[in-house]
Amino acid sequence: MKSDIRNLDLNLLKALDALLDERSVTRAAARLALTQPAVSGMLTRLRDAFNDPLFIRAPHGMVPTLRAQALAAPVKQLLTDAETLLQPVVFDPLEADFTWTIAATDYALKAVIVPFIAALKPMAPGIRVRIIPESPATLLAQTERGEVDIALLTPHDTPPELHSRALYQEEYVCLLREDHPQANQPLTLDRFCALEHVLVSWQGDSFRGVTDDALAALGRTQRVGLSVSSFLVLPEVLAVSEMIAVVPRRLAKMASGMKIAAPPLAIPGFTKSMAWHERNHRDPAQQWLRELLLQTSQQER
């Protein structure tokens, strides 16, 4: 008769292993911290499962049958493998070899990912980082399928089903070239509104942004002469024109040959956060990478 593995569990296999080692129900019970009747009952279940007596009573203990002897090594291996499965996963950055996919805007690429990579590579040279464009509309599905490990976005764009953590609070500043006629003069509200502006919008097709909302509250407007979809082109545009731009401070600090000025009005900043799926939440490697991302983003102030 064929044995049914569904009749077995780890506790029964532990009992069989102890019985094979001890050759005594009493000693096996003591080793397992169980009562003798409990181990006797387990032996009965084992005999039924394997359709074999397994042990024969003898004057000096129990003698294993040939079937029991044949089971000894496989049972020990199964228990060892099961124990290994239950051990906490140990993550070693130096030995890690996998790809981590980040969804990010060009702003996050420069402000967050560049310093992150600088810290990551000496610590975990085998981890490859893939950057893909951030798409809030498809982000949840991408994280569910494992296509994105982490996304860098704002709380407003974060799907509620994802875990998230704030990285830092960003503020806006004005950016213009160092030799701009306005560079060494106080930037008044009137002058700010009179200057021609470069605006960054997601699609590059909008001429209204957060600055316009702040100005509207004061009954003022700005003069937008160029709308682009990327922050990264701004320094080049500003370097060859007399335009001005309102940009996140972290990007402004990275631009060479530029002058940073405080806006003449209050412009609300934003929170940059990271978001990830429950499927990655408890993985030691993912936890380590998220912590490193948090540390490096908070150092770049």
Please name every model-derived segment.
Residues 17-34:
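Short helix-boundary/capping micro-motifs
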Residues 47-69:
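A short LG(V/I)-centered, amphipathic sequence patch enriched
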Residues 60, 66, 90-109, 123-127, ...:
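Interdomain hinge and pocket-entrance segments immediately C-terminal to HTH DNA-binding domains
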Residues 94, 161-197, 286-287:
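Flexible hinge/capping segments at coil-to-helix
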Residues 95-159, 221, 228:
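Central regulatory/effector-binding core of bacterial HTH transcription factors
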Residues 112, 178, 189, 260-301:
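A late-sequence structural motif
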Residues 160-166, 170, 229-281:
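Beta-alpha-beta core module
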Residues 182-184, 189, 197-218, 282-286, ...:
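Secondary-structure junction motif
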